[in-house]
Amino acid sequence: MSHETYHANVRSVSRSMLADFIESPAIYHGRYVAKTLERQSETHAMAMGTLTHCAVLQGERLDSMLAVIPDSLLSEDGGLRTKAAKEWKAAQQAEGKIVVKAHEADNQLADIIGMRDAVLGVSVVTDSGVRVRLREDIFQRHGVAIETPFDWIDTESGFPMRAMPDAMVIIDGNAIVVDVKTIADINRAEFAIADSYWLQVAHYTEGVAAAHGVPTDRCLFLFVFVEKSAPYRTRVMQMSANMKAKALEEWRVAVSQLHDRITRDDWNDWRSGELIVVDRFIKGIQ
């Protein structure tokens, strides 16, 4: 299933939909209920991340993933201004390709190859003492589910839910879920998990438990971060047991709040109409 098809489905609750609700009930209502707001359009950085996933997870030929702009379509300032140029770009993007200029193509390919090779070369020992080689033990393992969506019903809220992990294997009643993230600065990876990626761990862990019968404490979720530029440094991270438990609690709170908002048809934003007193001083220029 393509990413576009997966995200177009709003009949069940995905991790990204729940993230939108946590950010703003008004945004959730606009995108998924009233459908007056469009989803964020794909940026160049997002497209590069998608292509890196294709290279790592699906082994697609890299030369088929980029569309080099013909010189004849470029205007004098180097842009795509004509109707023909814009139609060509739209057609390439509809096929999932990233559009680049000829002088950019080599650099883009080098970065994708660098990130792919860095991720596939990762080997790590988990906190339980098990060595995991991403290429052999996960991505190329017999029975691995690569970007395969699954559905479940959340029994407490009654919501239909869905998830699509990058890669998942179930071995002897234990699940290993791997998610690949590209990042500009590898030193920010830990902050990214604490800030927003905790929701992904909780959502997928709940889904694996409900859809595949794997207890939440037997679902290992590994984030594999890879830097977007040379030397393509990597970090493999997992949440501590305490942080994972907290993430699952916060996930349940968010789902319960979404259920309450739908029941009451109340889409006012968090703290809307409330006077917020700021009590943090930002030091100025000396």
Residue ranges and their predicted role:
Residues 51, 199-207:
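Short amphipathic alpha-helical face segments that pack within enzyme cores
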Residues 44, 48, 200, 247:
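Hydrophobic (often cysteine-bearing) scaffold residues that line and stabilize catalytic clefts
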Residues 1-162, 272:
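Metal-dependent nuclease catalytic cores that hydrolyze phosphodiester bonds in DNA/RNA
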Residues 56-61, 154, 182-185, 209-213:
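Hydrophobic/aromatic-lined pockets within catalytic cores
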Residues 92-93, 97-103, 191-195, 206-286:
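Metal-dependent nuclease catalytic regions and adjoining charged, substrate-binding loops involved
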Residues 143, 150-198:
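Non-catalytic protein-protein interaction segments used by genome-maintenance enzymes to assemble
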Residues 49-53, 167, 251:
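A residue-level signal for conserved active-site and pocket-lining positions in enzyme catalytic cores
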Residues 136-140, 169-176, 209-219:
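Secondary-structure boundary elements
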